Amino acid sequence: MIKVIKNEKQMMEKTIKEWAINMVRTYTWLTIKFEYSERFRTILIDLVYPPQYGNDEDFHRDALTFNDKMCKVYGDNAPLFTNNEKLFKLSDKARIICIKSYSSSKN
């Protein structure tokens, strides 16, 4: 895997944050966590949701569409996705986007 350069990482983080805010506005039960991982040399994204929403087709379509977009733009450096930390764990320092955090910090 090729190391993500600083400017590319910042652009990727901005894109992820904007997407995450839109997703939690649409799917109010969703929480999105993300952070850069030195180990994986890319950004890790965790989509956190209650089990009853695991079969929401619109949600999965929107998440997969974003994943495809990121793969086209960043190739091997594209972020890695997981659901409810099934594939990897994020640290306590991960950014968290959810309705509560977005509402309390709109700036």
Q: Where are the model-predicted features located?
A:
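Short secondary-structure junctions
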Residues: 20-31, 71-75
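A short amphipathic beta-strand at an alpha->beta junction
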Residues: 68-100
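A short interface-forming secondary-structure element
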Residues: 42-64
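Short, internal active-site loops enriched in acidic
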Residues: 38-41, 48-50, 85-89
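Charged, low-complexity intrinsically disordered segments and flexible loops
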Residues: 103-107
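Short edge beta-strands and adjacent turn/loop segments
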Residues: 24-46
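Well-ordered, non-membrane alpha-helical segments in soluble/globular domains
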Residues: 13-19, 56-68
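N-terminal presequence-like segments and adjacent domain-start helices
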Residues: 1-14
